[in-house]
UniProtKB/Swiss-Prot annotation:
HAMAP family: IlvC (MF_00435). Residues 186-331 form the KARI C-terminal knotted domain. It comes from Saccharolobus islandicus (strain M.14.25 / Kamchatka #1). This is Ketol-acid reductoisomerase (NADP(+)). Its cofactor is Mg(2+). Binds 2 magnesium ions per subunit. Belongs to the ketol-acid reductoisomerase family. Residues 5-185 form the KARI N-terminal Rossmann domain. GO terms for molecular function: ketol-acid reductoisomerase activity; magnesium ion binding; NADP binding. Substrate binds at S255. Involved in the biosynthesis of branched-chain amino acids (BCAA). Catalyzes an alkyl-migration followed by a ketol-acid reduction of (S)-2-acetolactate (S2AL) to yield (R)-2,3-dihydroxy-isovalerate. In the isomerase reaction, S2AL is rearranged via a Mg-dependent methyl migration to produce 3-hydroxy-3-methyl-2-ketobutyrate (HMKB). In the reductase reaction, this 2-ketoacid undergoes a metal-dependent reduction by NADPH to yield (R)-2,3-dihydroxy-isovalerate. Signal peptide: none annotated. Gene3D superfamilies: 6.10.240.10, NAD(P)-binding Rossmann-like Domain. The keyword Glycoprotein does not apply.
Amino acid sequence: MKSTSKIYTDKDSNLDVIKGKRIAVLGYGSQGRAWAQNLRDSGLNVVVGLEREGKSWELAKSDGIIPLHTKDAVKDADIIIFLVPDMVQRTLWLESVQPYMKKGADLVFAHGFNIHYKLIEPPKDSDVYMIAPKGPGPTVREYYKAGGGVPALVAIQQDVSGTALQKALAIAKGIGATRAGVIPTTFKEETETDLFGEQVILVGGIMELMKAAFETLVEEGYQPEVAYFETINELKMLVDLVYEKGITGMLKAVSDTAKYGGMTVGKFVINEDVRKRMKEALQRIKSGKFAEEWVEEYGRGMPTVVNGLSQVQNSLEEKIGNQLKDLIQKGKPKS
């Protein structure tokens, strides 16, 4: 089992490496807004590249950030940061970035999908690197303003200049990540582990586990309201404990009955067959099969996603959850 021996912090990074360089942040959504403001507040020269003059354009202006059309933002940029959704990046690259960017400009990503699966093939004379914050954009901004930072991953795909890592760490410092710590990785590792986590636990796994547990109780005649509390609603409390204190801390916080039941039945439910299917899911990611399917799905208008979302919205557990929201919120203390 490999483990990194190096975590980069403020002392390993220097903003002077990119001072005076023009940075174009493409996109002004959750991450784009946070990055642009943090980099600006770190004393760097930042513009935002957008495809049209809409709400994001006006929001950037109100935040004191200069918005430009993408092709205008990249033509003079030394560093181009892609912070638009994965499936928009290839089209944006082909139509609005590649034809207009200046020779040798750096290409920066927050997720490795498009580079790893070769949907974007960068010029040979560009440094290509990634800084991937391990938190949503609003948290990246909130922590920065409070003097902290969200941890991040850093990876170098192309190092033509010989200074790609130094520039990547400077960007990481500019958004506040080095205040916490930046862990080195590769585009391959970040992409494959990110997709795996989303599919088998964070979105896919936990969603299906909650659904299966809820439906099992309801099918056996238990009230759906009670089933919802026991299989879905209480999950937040346990996840919060794991987040704050680790798995050991969570186990120490629950009852002895819960500990014994969890340690015995948990392995019965998540057994070797499940682990085998997890490995199969990982192989689909590593082979590129998932990426191929997702690109095709996206091109067809995402029918699987649309139909799946509709099924979830119309499910019994969702209806019960919506009915219980007022009850759940009623007991929360006023802040």
